[in-house]
Structures are given as C-alpha cells and as structure tokens.
C-alpha cells in the first residue's frame, strides 16, 4: 500500500513539473508575487502549465482566438485576468468555472459577436468587467450580468452596438462606474437601466439626442455624476427632448467632445439651471459655433445649487468676435469656482467680473490675457470674494502692473502667474495685502528684488535664471527654487520660519551641518538632482546627522556624487572615502612627526653607538679608495708618521725626534707641525702622510685619547689596518692609561694592545736605552 502511495505522489509531481516548465517557456515573466506578464508575446493560445499559485495573469496584446474549458481550470486563485487586444471570438461556456476569486476581467478589444450569461455565472467575486471594443450588437435577450452581485465598474459598447433591451442590466443594483460606448446606439428600450438604483459615475458616448433622452429618463434618480460625450446640441427643437433632465438628481454634469450653437446654449443653460441638486458643470474639448450672442436672457434662480463651472479646451473659431455675455450676468453671481482654461480668453468684461460676487476660485490659465486686458478684467469691484487666482500661461510681461491690477483684491491669498514672460522686475510693487502664496515659476526672472511681497508664506520661483536668493521673507514657510543656478542654500536668517524647501536641479555642490541646522523649522528639503562634490566634510555631515533621511526628499536614490571621479555616479549615502582623502593634513602632520621622531632616535642611537664616526670613516675611506693605489716602496718618504697630542709635543720633539733622527742610520719622521703641506685640508694631509710612511707611531697618553685630531689619525690608521691587512701601527705608552680609555670602536687597535707587546716609556733612565733599541727595531721591521 505504501509503495502505491509513493508512486502516486511521484507521478503527480512529475506531471506538475512539466506544466510549470511549459508555462515558463511560454511566459518568462512571472515574479515573486505570482504575477505573470505574458503580454506582447505573439501567443496563439493561453499557455499551459497555469497553477493555483498565480494571482495575476496578463495575456493582453497577443493573438489568442479561443478560450477553452481546460485553459484556466487550474488557475483557481486568479484575482486579475487581462485578455484585452487579442482576437478572441469564442469562449467555452465553462471556461471561467474555476475563477470564483476573480476580481478583474478585461475582454475588451476582441472579436466577441455575442455575450453569454453562462460565462460570467461562476464569477461571483468579480468587481470590474471590461467588454468594450468587441463586435456584439446587443447584450442578448436577458442580462449577462445577473450573477455579478459584487460588480463595481462595467465598461461595454462598440461601434456595432446598437440596442439596449429591457432586462439587460437585471441583477445589478449598484455601480460605481458604468460606461457605455454607444456612438451608434439607435434603440433603447425604456426601463433598461431602471433596475440600477445608484450609479456614482455614468459615462455615455452617444450621438442621438432622442436615444439619450430615453436613457436619461431611467437615470433621473440614480446617476450622481452624468458624463455625456460626443453629443451634438445643434438643433434647438431637439433640445426640448432633454427637458426631462430638469428633474434629474445628478450633482455633476460633464459634457465632453460635444457641439453647441448660439441657439442651443440658452436652452441647455435653462435645463441645467432647473436641476435641483446640480452643483458642478464641466465642459471639455467641446466646440461652440457662435460668438455668444444669446438673445434669450437667462435669469438666475436663487434656489439653484450650481456653484462650479469648468471649461477646458473650448474651441470658438471666431473667438475674437465674442460678446460680453450680457445675457448670463445674473447666472454668475452664485458661482464659487470657475475654470476657463485654454479657451483663447483675451478679456473678461469688467461688468461680468463685477457680477461674480461669490467667486472664490478663478482659473484663467493658458489663455491670451495681457497686462492691459488684465487691468480691465480686474477692474474696481471685480471678484470681491476671490481667494485663488490662476493666470499662468498667459501673455503678462509687467509684474509691477500685474500687482497693481490685483491690488484691490483684499481676500486674494493665492496667485499663480507662472509661465508668463516678466524678465527683469522692479524694486517696488503693490500687492493684495493678504497675499500668502505666489507662483512665479518659469517667468524668466534673472534676479529677485523687494518687489516680491514680504507677506508671503509660500513662494515658487522655480525654472528661472536665479543665481542667488537674498530676499527677507519673515513669514515664508515654503520655498521652491527648483531648476535655477543656485550654488548654495539661502541664508536661514532671511527666512527663519521656513518649513519646506525645494532646491533640486540647481548647481548646489554641498551644504554644511551649520547651514542645514540654521533652518530651525525645516521639515522637508528637496536637494535632489544636484551635482554633489562628495568631500569628507559633506559626507561626514550626511552620515552622522540624525534624522536627515526623514528631511531629505528623494533620499537616497536622487542624491548622486559628481566628484571625486572615483565615486562619480554613486549614491551620496553609500560613499565612504579613505582616511588619506579625508584627513590629509592630519596624516601629513603625523607622518612628519613620525619622521622627526625616527630621525631623532637615529641621532640618539647613532651618537651612543658612534654612527657618526662610522659614517665619517666610510666617507674618508671611500675617498681614499678613489685615489690611485698606495705609492710603491720607492715613494715612501718617511719611516714613520708620528701621531701625538699637542700636550705631548715636548717629549716627541725634544726627545724622540732627537733619538731617532740622529741615530745611525737616521730615521725619517713625519710630524704634522713640520711636514704637513700648508693650505692643504688637514684630513688629506693626514691620509697622505700615513700613506707615505712605513709605520705609524702613536704616542698614547691621556691627552692623546682626548684629542680630536689624534682620533682622526687613529681612525685612518685603523682603516689602513683593515685595508692592507698588516701591522703598521706602533703604540707607545708615554704614560700608563687604561685600555678602556681607548674608544671601543677601535676594535682592531684594542686587539693589538691585548694580543701584542707595545712599548711603554720607562721613567728609569737605565731602561730608556732599551726602549729606544726596541723602538728602532720595530721601525725597521
């Protein structure tokens, strides 16, 4: 029994391993989180080997045509399945039978000609379904979504989609987003969407007003945000079909890629004005055929809730003929937030501005406003409640005039005038007294002056040509200096309350501990994307400053060393310089000290062990060796060179010289007093005299061993002993001395005294005759 169990286990493992291997061969991009990216691989089928481990499977942008029953059978833990942009035309009925945990299914942009409720039956956990871009013309006779109780977002439709039937959405009670691409939708059965009680965001792309009217009738109380696309509001008579919208509970209406005319605008405004809960209207990428001559006066409904108007990229071909909008002045008084962006606005009529009594936010960015037109638009009494004004990407060029035009806006605290062309700015300007935020980025300002108001709490001067920052702004909390040419941090004393600063993409090389800590309130500093010089001081500060990682934005990946070359490209936080690079002066001082101590020790040791003597002797010996070899015997001039102390000269000159030079035969003696060549270096005289003498007589006494020149003569005689290997020295003890009195370095002479007989001058006259006989015999040997 045990054997059969083992065989079964081994067989299962053997089957499982080839499956996983097959998956890896077909799809090589499975990561540690069990997410497999098999997109753009030219697959014709779902790869085999899918296991229960996989949670995300991306098969988008392949050539898959069919999904079969067994393809996904083992992928029981799939949460996300992406099959968009394939060629899928057929799905077996139970293909998704094992995907009870699936939350997102994308079948968009395939070739499905029909939808089957059986496909989605097992997907009771599904939250997001995308089936747009296929070729089905309807959703079937019943609801394909009836079992999808947890569905949150649904995207359907395609160019062939033409009919929505009653019951197609049965089973769906709530949707966060429903998007229907119905450009060619021609038939809508009333009540089809009525089963959905609430849709937070309803997006419908549709071209027929009558069909749209039928759809809206079913969404009156369920759609919170109604997003309409590609609808042409061009025929006034057809606009009447939309009167039903006045009963809608929608809070926001978006009109995108729609068409309007002067004749239909008043009708549409009238409908929107009647919607009891409408708070926001948004128009994007629309076209207006007209010049604003709306002959029908629009009166404000004091009970209306509309507060926000957004117009972006509105195309008005004859914008230069546009009127002053007299017909809608009454409607504007309740608006709190208005955005008119990229719509070629070159002037806001003064009267219109004065009617915007409740306006708190105004965005006129990416338009054609100039200095003069702004002065007219912001006339006295205009925008009395305005707090935020965005005039970026216009044609402003005079900063002083801009400030003066807005000076009367007492409530204005945020002003964005970025991406204008101010250039040089004056020293003095007038500004609204409560201005707290000013955006002057990308305005080609080369230098900041006191024109900048001192009341600011936030200042953005990014992307200019600034070399430094020297303004005193005592209330400033946020400063943005990105993309300038600053080389150092600003002075903290000028901006003592700064909390956040961005100085990225400048010419900042480093900053010190003192500079960093001088900003007492600093919580965020973005100094990324600078060319840092990773000096020892900078690195030491970075590595040891507590909490700097929490302050620096983008740390550590955005802080890169530019120099030295050895660490270029490395992250500042990971660089460690050597001791030599960081403490060069200290190291040089230490080396010099050690060298000095070494020399001092050498001097002391040399003095103690007579190193100087050895050096002098070596030099003298080398000098002597460089001379021609010793003169032959016929060049010997003296029988002996006499080395003696000046204190013993009386005995040498009056006694020894008399005895030896007057002997028969006489001896020739060399005395330094008598025979040294005048003007010649003493050392050379000593060497020459010793070399020209057959013997060297040393008259030893206490005075002798204390004489410097006698020591020289002993030295050279000592070298001669070693060089010629003969006994040329004759020692005469004029008075008894201890052998220890002779310097220890003369080991050869000490050995002679210890091993050979030396002559000692006897005080007894009877013995002196014997002394002279022995001396003469030694000289002749």
Swiss-Prot record:
LRR repeats: 53-74, 77-98, 101-122, 125-146, 150-171, 174-195, 358-378, 385-406, 411-432, 434-455, 456-474, 475-496, 497-518
GO molecular function, one term: NAD+ nucleosidase activity, cyclic ADP-ribose generating
Record-linked Gene3D superfamilies: Ribonuclease Inhibitor, Toll/interleukin-1 receptor homology (TIR) domain
GO biological process: detection of bacterial lipoprotein; inflammatory response; innate immune response; toll-like receptor signaling pathway
The keyword Lipoprotein is annotated on this UniProt entry: no
Known glycosylation sites: 37, 109, 150, 184, 301, 313, 390, 439
Protein modification: N-glycosylated.
Subunit annotation: Binds MYD88 (via TIR domain).
Family, per entry: Belongs to the Toll-like receptor family.
Name under which the protein is recorded: Toll-like receptor 2 type-2
Name of the gene this protein is made from: TLR2-2
